Amino acid sequence: MADVKRVYTFGNKEAEGNGKMRELLGGKGANLAEMNLIGIPVPPGFTITTEVCSEYYAHGKDAVIQMLRPEVEKAMKNIEKLTGMKFGDKEMPLLVSVRSGARASMPGMMDTILNLGMNDQAVEAVAKRTGNPRFAWDSYRRFVQMYGDVVLGMKPESKEDHDPFEVIIEEQKHKRGVKNDTDLTTDDLKELVRNFKAAVKKQTGEDFPACPWDQLWGAVCAVFGSWMNDRAILYRKLNNIPAEWGTAVSVQAMVFGNMGENSATGVAFSRDAATGENLFNGEYLINAQGEDVVAGIRTPQQITIEGSKRWAVAQKVSEEERKAKFPSLEEVMPEVYKELDEIQHHLEQYFKDMQDIEFTIQDGKLWMLQCRNGKRTGAAMVKIAMDMLREGLIDEKTAVLRCEPAKLDELLHPVFDKKAIASAQVITKGLPASPGAATGPVVFFAEDAEKTLEKTGQRAILVRIETSPEDLKGMLDAAGCLLYTSDAADDRISV
């Protein structure tokens, strides 16, 4: 067992793995390696193989850590060499992200942790090095919140409960009289960190871990543990994904979209995932981190000018207001946008399929965090396959195989009668994230959607401020979902 390679490094346009190693590195790890090999800017890191996930369930946490320690320490030194920073250092601390990556895409089903390595010493060092204490403390509070949720189990226990960290944030915003997280000051964020840690101590009886290595092992094992959480099991069952596949874990040097107005994070699609139109599109948020976009907590701005104008028309926002308050990335950072557009085109041509990409802009520099074949509606599936056949990207056999029989059912979904819509009183409008029309009684909790179907045989309309992965069962039992803050980039909508 000692001779088995469990960790594969990547960075600086080199990688030990490649895109054909999905079974071992998972989809995310394989594509991170492949993007390095074709010259795409990717933060350095390493991937722990799917085989270790099986070992985790066979031998337990302590045995897996013991087996992994030498390879992980060596791989971390490689990141340190490429970044000039050191994991656990008090002067130049290296912060990392920890993400899951099964061989089949499971959007939103498993867990991610950002800014790992943060502690009371690291936050001061980051503040000093960047000259941006607000950014440092914002990154620290995000880390405590994510780690508390994913690793320490600080989650709502019932439908009446609220996320304990969000409650603390809302109380702080109310106290300060502000609406958005970005309006909180450095001192506010320091207070949030103190209150978060106090909440962790109260609920778990333990202090929040300060040692970066303890944090890392806790996060890695939590990702392996998330492979068997209820929502992941349900998703695998629905999509015929074997439990034996396991998940890989990718650890990467952090790049920061929350460093200020010249930083951003976003998700994009090389073609329209709803219609299949050959139109680059996506969303971004200035001064934010990746989870802010895919979690659907804040409504992002559009990447392209064309997309931004379409959004403004749908939202009845004037062109003047759009340009002033909701400009596209193409307008705000034209050079970065141009590079992003070139990369998405390169990736689609290389992988010969519509790409779903995640990116971060740190102080004006673009970094790619992920690419994968994008989820799409049934109508988009057919159009993309036929368009790519005509473009010579794929052959006829591939085009036919791209059309999943189960997805073709979407083309038969009910739609609203045009005459009825014309005469109806419209209460509100939003962005469609999936095809078809739906009717049913309104419920406000996922478990109520489950109970409605169970007791009455009728599917309800699930109305939420935003969804979380825990809502998956209720979403599947509902006729439709109406969300207040989510958008088409929300991972939960695409499942």
Model-derived features with residue positions:
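HINT superfamily self-processing domains
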Residues: 473-476, 486
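Long alpha-helical scaffolds
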Residues: 266, 449, 488-489
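Extended, non-globular alpha-helical segments
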Residues: 432-470
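Proteolytic maturation boundary segments
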Residues: 414-415, 419-443
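Nucleotide/phosphate-binding sheet-loop regions of phosphoryl- and nucleotidyl-transfer enzymes
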Residues: 1-424, 458-461, 466-470, 477-479
